[in-house]
A protein has these predicted regions:
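Patatin-like phospholipase
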Residues: 1-371
Length: 371
């Protein structure tokens, strides 16, 4: 199929807290539907649409980001759907043939609470790192995101190659940058910092990357460990789950175009402490749109939102879409003010003023949502 005949689909997997099973279920169903569609086209069956639709980018935050990495690890293998269970025992039975189900439903056992409340992590770390024992996250990540597990490097027809996958991170140190004013002296410079961070991967590419996309190959193992750590970092819900340390090559971080205005990081390796990526960017659809615009050469929103001309669209999968806030109730009590303050900081951190006008228009062809 000619490149300009491809319709590019970008998946945005929103933060899901404990509803990762919803996101994983939608993704599992979508992949199965695309697989069946491909088979029907190959067999030239009647009444089958012939469009060439491919998933070209997957971006996610928190549980959505974790699901995105897990999904990227299974695309080169046969994805076996889980038969609809008829009893609770069947629902929680181990389903290793389907990692999306394995990650969010049967997990590591029928009852996860004893693992999360176990205090062995305190004895091991000699300190409290979170309210819950986060070791189960490590066990799941090691079980589901493995190096050299895929012998087949080919993608199915509904996946664009090379597929791009990215996660949002909340970088606790942040990236400093200087705001210069005329008359500034070296002793009186004005510095700020941003804490948005991204782990960006491009699957199955051997080329030397000139942009922010780190090569990721589950067949050779290249950068699989980095992807696994990034997946745990984007899902590190603060206080309840421990923060995560992520090491990346400095040159890979300095190539991230969405952070070009910050000061370049120094040294050969950049090590960060991170918490849940959804804190600052829970629905990173603006980055998904950036990637789609590059692939289609359609940077004009009037073109990519026009159903007569668009060559791509964003599919936002969001278990908890935001609702209109209730009327604010004045309450100057200490605890209420603290809750208001946290809500204010998170809300402002997630705000995307530059794209608010288009995000509220339900008639646009360039974006859809499953919630």
């Amino acid at each position: 199929m000619e490149e300009n005949k491809i319709f590019h689909l970008g998946l945005c997997l929103a933060g899901s807290v404990s509803a990762g099973s919803y996101t994983a279920g939608v993704l599992d169903y979508l992949l199965d539907a695309l697989k069946i569609w491909e088979e029907r086209k190959r067999q030239n069956l009647p009444d089958t649409p012939t469009q060439d639709v491919r998933i070209s980018v997957i971006g996610g935050a928190s549980g959505g980001g974790m699901t995105g990495i897990i999904a990227s690890s299974i695309l080169q293998n046969e994805i076996i759907p889980v038969k609809f269970p008829t009893s609770l025992k069947e629902i929680l039975a181990d389903q290793p043939q389907n990692k999306l189900y394995n990650a969010w439903v049967d997990m590591l056992g029928e009852d996860m609470f004893p693992m999360m409340l176990d205090t062995a992590d305190i004895d091991k770390n000699k300190e409290i790192t979170s309210l819950l024992n986060s070791d189960f996250i490590d066990k799941l990540a090691n079980k589901l995101v493995k190096a050299k597990e895929n012998k087949n490097r080919n993608f199915p027809g509904y996946i664009y190659s090379p597929l791009k996958v990215f996660l949002t991170l909340t970088n606790l140190a942040g990236f400093p940058y200087e705001i210069s004013y005329r008359g500034n002296t070296t002793l009186n410079k004005y510095y700020m910092a941003v804490h948005n961070d991204y782990a960006c991967f491009k699957l199955n590419t051997d080329e030397a990357e000139k942009d922010e996309w780190m090569p990721l190959d589950f067949a050779t193992g290249k950068n699989v460990e980095t992807a696994r750590l990034a997946a745990m970092a984007t899902g590190a819900f603060p206080i309840f789950l421990k923060s995560r340390v992520l090491a990346r090559e400095t040159r890979e971080v300095n190539k991230i175009r969405w952070l070009k205005y910050v000061d370049p990081v120094q040294g050969n390796e950049y090590v960060t402490q991170n918490i849940d990526g959804g804190i600052l960017n829970n629905e990173p659809f603006e980055i998904v749109r950036f990637v789609l615009n590059e692939l289609t050469s359609q940077p004009d929103s009037t073109i990519y939102n026009d159903p007569d001309f668009f060559k791509s669209t964003i599919l936002l999968i969001d278990p908890f879409p935001s609702e209109k806030p209730a009327d604010f109730k004045i309450d100057t009590g200490f605890l209420k003010t603290l809750a208001y303050t946290i809500n204010c900081l998170v809300g402002q951190g997630r705000a995307k003023p530059g794209i608010l006008a288009s995000s509220v228009n339900i008639d646009l062809a360039g974006q859809f949502m499953i919630a």
